[in-house]
Amino acid sequence: MAKAINTRRRRALKTGIQGLGLSSLLTGCGSLSKVLDDEIKLDPDSHTESHQRLVGKKPTSAKDQGSAITNHGQAPDKNPRITTESPAHAQRQDESSSINILSLLKLPTIEREFRAAWVASVANIDWPSKPGLSSASLRAEIDRICTQAAFIGLNALIVQIRPSADALYASAIEPTSEFLVGQQGAALADGFDPLSYWIQSCKQHGLEFHAWFNPYRARHASAKSGFHAKHLAKQQPKLVVKYGDHWWMNPAEPKALEWSLHVIDDVVSRYDIDGVHLDDYFYPYPIQAKDKKQSALDFPDETQYKRYRQLGGRLDKPDWRRSHVDTMVQKLYQRVHKQKPWVRVGISPFGIGKPALRPAGIQGFSQYDQLFADVERWCSEAWLDYLAPQLYWKIEQQSQSFEVLLNYWSERLGSKRHLWPGLYTSSIGQAGRMWTSSEILAQIERQGRQPLATGHIHFSMVALLNDRDQIATRLHKGPYQRPSLVPSSPWLSKGRPERPQLIAPDQRGLLSWERPLGSQPWGTTATRWVLHHRANEQSPWSMTHGDVNLNPIILKAKEQYVLRLLNRVGEASDAIAFTWQI
C-alpha cells in the first residue's frame, strides 16, 4: 500500500484523483443450573445480530439487553450436577441442592464489530522497523504490536507478507523480502519464520490474522537490492515489465496470474490464517509521462493487446484490462475457499467508485478507468467476503466526503457481504494534513450509524503504536471500551457448533464441556468461546471470549453466565445459561 512514500498516490488522495473445554471429566463439588431448553429455537448470532452497533455505547442495564427467554421444561442432563429448570421449580429454590433456579433470563447479544489495523512491510512503514533485524528483535516487535492491538481493543491485524513478489515468511517459491532481511533472497536468521510467529502471537492475544498480498507489483521504487535469482523477474522475465520506477507483473499474461495465485495457494495451505487480503494496487497508479503531450505514461501491454485482437478479441483496451483483474479476483476467491472455506477474502480498493455511479458532488480519481478495477462488479458478483474501501478523506471534505462515500459503498455491497472501511489514521500529526484523533473518532461514530458497515480498519498500525494525538488512548477509553468479536460470515458456514454440554466445574471454578469424538465438519467445530456474566439481574452483562484450546474459563460463584461456542467464521451455537455455587 505504501501510501506514506508514494507521492503520486498522495496527490490522488489530496485532490480525490485523488475449553479450555477439557476432554476428560472434572471432579468437584460445584453445581450448575441450566436455564434454556432445547425446544427454544434461537439463533443467537444471525447476520442481523452482527449488525448491532457498538460505537459510543456504554454498558446498559439488564432490562435493556437481549430478548426474554423462558423455560418450557426438559429431561435432566445425564450429569447429575447439571440440573434442568422446569416450570415446577421456577418459583422456588431447590432445597435438595445448592442450585439457584432462574425462571426468566434476557439473553445478551454478542457484541460484534471488525476493529483492525494494517501492518505495512513495504518500505518498513510498520514492521519490521528496519531491515536486517535479528529473530529476537523481530519477535519482540511482533509481540509489541499484538499487545498494543489487544490493549486498544482491536480484534484483527492485516499484515503485509508479499509486497513485491517477495516473501516475509519461509517460501520455496519467492525470495525473502529485502524489507525483512536487507538483501533480497538472504536467508532468515536461525530458520525463524515470521509468519508462523505472527499467527501464534495473534492467537495468544485474541486477534485474527489476515495475510496481505500485493498480486501484481514486482519491485517497489524504494527497493535498493537487485532481483534475486529466485525472483519472478529472473525466473520468467517476459511476465514482468518496467513502469516508471516500478516493476510490475503484466496482468495480461496468464502465467503471471497463475504465479501469484500459486503463491497465495501455498500460504493458505501451509499456514493457519484467518483471511487473504488484497489492497488497491491492481494496474499501477498512473505515472506522468516525460513527453508532456501525454497526460500519463501508458502501461506497456500493447504487444499482448495486439495478440488478443489478432485472435478475434473485441474488447477495447480498458475493458480488456479490467477483464484480467476481474479474472484474478474471481479465481482468487474460488481457490481460497476450495482449500479452506473458512478463510475470508477481503479487498481494500481506492475509495471512490466509478464515475457513472458516483453520488452527486463526488469528484476525483477513477480506479475504474486508471487502475482498471471494477469494484462495483466484484460487489455484485460477491467475489469477496469483505470490502474495505480506503475512505481517506475527512467527513467535511465535500468532493470526497467520508460519510457520503461510506453510504455509496453500502448501497453497492448491500447486506450480502461485510463493509469495513479503511480509515486514514496515519494522517494524524502529519505536516500539512491538519488531522486530529477527533476526526477518526467521528468517522468511527459515523460508521456505527450505517447499519451495513460493521467495522473499520486503521491505516496504519504505527499511528496506534505511537498514540498520535492520543488516538490509541481515546479508542481504548471510548468506542473500544467494551470488547467486540469479528462479525460472523454465515454464507461461508455449513452448520454451527452444538450447544455446549457442560461438565460441572471443580472447586476452582474451572469450566469444561463435552468434546465430540473424532473429526467433525469444520462448521460444527468450536474454535472459540464467548461468555457473558453478571452478578445479578440488576447488573449489566460483561463479555469475555477466548480460544477453546488456549484460554480456560474460570467461574465465580453465584454469578449468572451465558455461554456460546463459535466456529472459524464466527457462527455461534445456541446459548446455555447457568449459575454456579460451591
Regions found by a protein language model. Give the residues of each.
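Polysaccharide-binding and catalytic clefts of secreted carbohydrate-active enzymes
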Residues: 162, 200, 205, 234-383, ...
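Conserved aromatic anchor
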Residues: 509-523
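Substrate-binding cleft of secreted/luminal carbohydrate-active enzymes
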Residues: 386-395, 417-486
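Active-site-adjacent "subsite" loops/lids of carbohydrate-active enzymes
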Residues: 120, 124-137, 216-266
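Extracellular fibronectin type III
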Residues: 570-582
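N-terminal export signals
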Residues: 5-6, 11-33
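Catalytic domains of carbohydrate-active enzymes, especially glycoside hydrolases
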Residues: 140-165
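Beta-strand-rich modules
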Residues: 555-571
